[in-house]
C-alpha cells in the first residue's frame, strides 16, 4: 500500500513538473522577459514619424499634394473615404496599440526610477499622439484610453484633447529641466533615435509642439499670437534642431515609407496645384528653384501636375504624363536613388525649424507686427531651401543641389520675399508653408487648409490664401456637397466594436467626415 502512495506521489510530482514545463513554453531563455524603460522608446519614435507617412497617402489627396490617377476618379481625391476599411487610420492604430500600454509601462517605470528625462520624453510622445489624432479625427478617446477593464469607450471633446496636450507638454518641459534623480543622457540615448538623449533638444521640441497647438486657435477669440511667438522663440533655433528620423535601410520595416524600394507611391502623381505654386503661376512668374529638386518632371523634361477632377492622365501623351514622385514612369528604378523625401534613406522629419518659423510669421502677421512676420517668413523660406538640399544628400539622390546664386535670386524676388513688411501677405506665408510641409507635414498642412476653409481669402488683398486650389467638383456622394474636415475613426476598432461611443458623437452619420472641427470654428 505504501508503494502505491509513493508511486502516486511521484506521479503527482511528475505531472506538476510537466505542467510547469508546459507553462514555461512562452518564456524565451534567450531574451529578457521584461525590458528596461529606455528600450520601449525606439519603436514609438519610429511610429511617431512613420505613421503620418502611412496616413499621408490619404491626407495628401485631400490637400492635393498628390493624386492617384486611375480609370475612375479616386475616393480620396473626391474628399471621401473607404467604407469598411482602416485606410486613413494608421495613426489611430499606432497610438492606441503600438504606443498604448507600452507607453504607459515606460512612463510608469521612468517615474518609479526617477528618470525624469525619459518621463518627459514619454509625456511628449503622449501629447504628440493626442495632437495628431484629434487633428485628424476630431473627437477622440482620451480619459478612458488604455483602460484594460473596458470594452467600449466614450469619446472626449476636441477642446479637452487640446487642453490635455498643453498640460502634458508643460509637465514634460518641467521634467526635462530636472537634473536630480536618475537623469542620465547615456541611458536615454540608448533608446532615443531622434536626439540621442539631448534633453535640450527635446525641450525645444516640446515648445515647438506647444506653438503648433496654440496657433490652431487662430479662428477663436481666445487666440493669443504673443504666446505662439514666445513658444516658437523657445523652440528650434536652426535646421540643426530639426527632428529627423534616420532609416537604416537594412530591411523593409526600417526603410523610409516613402522610399523607392517599398514602392508605396509608384502610382501617385503630383497635382496641378502644387506645380502651380512653384512654376511661377501663383507668384508673378518666379520659378522656384525647389521645383526641380522636389517634384518630378515628365519624360519630356517639363513639370506638369494632374487635376484630381480629371480621370487618369486626361489628354496628356505618354511623354507629357508626369512621372511618379520617385522620378520614374512606373515600377522602374527599384533600389535606385529617388528624389527628395522619396528615397529609401531620406530622413523624415517630425518637425522642422522652417515649419516653426512659418508659424511665427503667421502669428506675428495676425498680431499686426509685420516686421517680425517678414523676418520669420524669410528665415522659413531660406531654411527650407537648405532643408531640400540636405535631404537630397541623405542618399546622394539624383537631384542637383540648389546653388547659392539660385537661392539668393529667389529670396531677392519681391513676389516671394517683399522688402517692405507692409507688402507681406498671408497668401505668401501659407502657400510657402504648404511647400515646406509638402509630403511630410500632412496633419499640420491639412490643419492650415481647414483653418482657412480651403478657399479662404487674404482679408487685406482679397486674394486666395492658396492660389489655384479648388475642391473637387465631383465630391464623394456621402459628402452631400460638403468638403472634408476629418477622417472617420478607425473602422475595425470603432465601427465594429464601439458603435455606441460613435453614436454619441454623431460618428455613424454617412457625412460625419464633413463635420467641421471644434478648433477651426470661431
Segments from the language model and where they lie:
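Structured, solvent-exposed acidic/aromatic patches
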Residues: 35-38, 69-392, 419-426, 432
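Membrane-proximal, proline-rich intrinsically disordered regions
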Residues: 19-75, 79-82, 333-338, 453-522
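Bacterial N-terminal signal peptides that target proteins for export
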Residues: 1-6
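Hydrophobic helical h-region of N-terminal Sec-dependent signal peptides
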Residues: 9-11
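C-terminal/domain-terminus segments
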Residues: 229-234, 240-246, 445-467
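Active-site/pore-lining binding-face segments in mid-to-C-terminal subdomains
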Residues: 378-463
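Surface-exposed intrinsically disordered loops and tails
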Residues: 185-188, 310-325, 393-420, 462-478
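Bacterial Sec-type N-terminal signal peptides, specifically the leucine/valine-rich hydrophobic h-region
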Residues: 15-16
Amino acid at each position: 500500500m505504501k508503494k502505491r502512495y509513493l508511486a502516486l506521489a511521484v506521479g503527482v510530482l511528475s505531472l506538476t513538473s510537466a505542467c510547469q514545463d508546459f507553462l514555461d513554453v512562452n518564456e524565451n531563455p534567450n531574451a529578457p522577459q521584461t525590458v528596461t524603460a529606455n528600450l520601449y522608446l525606439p519603436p514609438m519614435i519610429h511610429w511617431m514619424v512613420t505613421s503620418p507617412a502611412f496616413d499621408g497617402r490619404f491626407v495628401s489627396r485631400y490637400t492635393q499634394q498628390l493624386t492617384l490617377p486611375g480609370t475612375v476618379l479616386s475616393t480620396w481625391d473626391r474628399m471621401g473615404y473607404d467604407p469598411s476599411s482602416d485606410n486613413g487610420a494608421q495613426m489611430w492604430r499606432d497610438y492606441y496599440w503600438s504606443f498604448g500600454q507600452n507607453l504607459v509601462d515606460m512612463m510608469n517605470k521612468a517615474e518609479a526610477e526617477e528618470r525624469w528625462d525619459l518621463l518627459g520624453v514619454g509625456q511628449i510622445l503622449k501629447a504628440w499622439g493626442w495632437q495628431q489624432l484629434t487633428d485628424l479625427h476630431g473627437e477622440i478617446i482620451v480619459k478612458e484610453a488604455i483602460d484594460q477593464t473596458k470594452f467600449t469607450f466614450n469619446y472626449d471633446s476636441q477642446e479637452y484633447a487640446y487642453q490635455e496636450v498643453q498640460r502634458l507638454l508643460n509637465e514634460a518641459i518641467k521634467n526635462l529641466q530636472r537634473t536630480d534623480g536618475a537623469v542620465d543622457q547615456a541611458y536615454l540615448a540608448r533608446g532615443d533615435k531622434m536626439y540621442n538623449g539631448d534633453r535640450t533638444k527635446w525641450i525645444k521640441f516640446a515648445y515647438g509642439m506647444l506653438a503648433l497647438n496654440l496657433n490652431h486657435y487662430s479662428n477663436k477669440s481666445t487666440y493669443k499670437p504673443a504666446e505662439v511667438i514666445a513658444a516658437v522663440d523657445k523652440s528650434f533655433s536652426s535646421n540643426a534642431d530639426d527632428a529627423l528620423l534616420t532609416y537604416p535601410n537594412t530591411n523593409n520595416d526600417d526603410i523610409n515609407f516613402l522610399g523607392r524600394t517599398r514602392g508605396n507611391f509608384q502610382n501617385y502623381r503630383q497635382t496641378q496645384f502644387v506645380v502651380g505654386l512653384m512654376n511661377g503661376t501663383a507668384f508673378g512668374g518666379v520659378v522656384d528653384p525647389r521645383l526641380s529638386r522636389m517634384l518630378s518632371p515628365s519624360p519630356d523634361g517639363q513639370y506638369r501636375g494632374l487635376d484630381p477632377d480629371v480621370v487618369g492622365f486626361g489628354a496628356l501623351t505618354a511623354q507629357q504624363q508626369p512621372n511618379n514622385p520617385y522620378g520614374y514612369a512606373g515600377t522602374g528604378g527599384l533600389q535606385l536613388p529617388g528624389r527628395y523625401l522619396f528615397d529609401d534613406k531620406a530622413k523624415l522629419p517630425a518637425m522642422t525649424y522652417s515649419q516653426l518659423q512659418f508659424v511665427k510669421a503667421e502669428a506675428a502677421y495676425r498680431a499686426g507686427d509685420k516686421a517680425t512676420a517678414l523676418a520669420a517668413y524669410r528665415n522659413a523660406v531660406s531654411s527650407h531651401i537648405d532643408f531640400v538640399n540636405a535631404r537630397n544628400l541623405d542618399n546622394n539622390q539624383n537631384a542637383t543641389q540648389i546653388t547659392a546664386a539660385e537661392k539668393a535670386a529667389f529670396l531677392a524676388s519681391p513676389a516671394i520675399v517683399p522688402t517692405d513688411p507692409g507688402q507681406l501677405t498671408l497668401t505668401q506665408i501659407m502657400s510657402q508653408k504648404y511647400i515646406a510641409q509638402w509630403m511630410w507635414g500632412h496633419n499640420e498642412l491639412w490643419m492650415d487648409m481647414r483653418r482657412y476653409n480651403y478657399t479662404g481669402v487674404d482679408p487685406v488683398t482679397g486674394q486666395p490664401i492658396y492660389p489655384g486650389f479648388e475642391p473637387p467638383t465631383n465630391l464623394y456622394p456621402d459628402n452631400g456637397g460638403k468638403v472634408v474636415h476629418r477622417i472617420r475613426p478607425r473602422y475595425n476598432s470603432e465601427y465594429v466594436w464601439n458603435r455606441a461611443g460613435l453614436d454619441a458623437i454623431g460618428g455613424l452619420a454617412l457625412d460625419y467626415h464633413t463635420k467641421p472641427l471644434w478648433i477651426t470654428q470661431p
